[in-house]
Amino acid sequence: MIDIDGVNLSNEDKSLLSSKHIGGLILFSKNFDSYTQLYNLIKEVRSIKENIIIAVDQEGGRVQRFKKEFTNIPSMQEASIFAKQNDDHGFIKDLAWLISSELIAVGIDINFAPVLDINRNLSTIIGNRSFSDDILEVINNASDYIDGMHEAGMKSSGKHFPG
């Protein structure tokens, strides 16, 4: 899996993408300017390699690569607190479905989410990206999140496992 430097493909990017050794592309904020630009970028990538896997980290909160023209998503800790306070057992699943639907609409195949670590305040990298400091809340919310992704048709990839 490779990444590219900007919002358009360079000749070097096109050459790399056409290599039989490249099977995936991950996109970041540096690759996003607008919904239309992103859609066209992905369309161009697929014209070079139809079966390439295109991925992103679109967790919500501070890890949301595409912001403008996409729904502003809270951190998973904020989402978990909201769901718990409002006794809304479907909120996390619905949120994941929404994120996934927006990504699928522009041509993204996989979202590297959810974070599966437990927020023990040991790492500033994880922090509010985790659903909770409670193991069962993390398990239940992560399961709901993955279900929402799958219902929308998005592949998931749990990351930052406990430890």
Q: Where does each model-flagged region fall?
A:
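Boundary/entry segment of secreted carbohydrate-active catalytic domains
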Residues: 1-10
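Enzymes and membrane/adaptor proteins characterized by extended Gly/Ser/Thr/Asp/Glu-rich
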Residues: 21-138, 160
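N-terminal glycine-rich anion-binding loops that anchor highly charged ligand groups
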Residues: 9-23
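Glycine-centered flexibility motif
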Residues: 6, 60-61, 148
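Phosphate/pyrophosphate-binding betaalpha-module
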Residues: 142, 146-162
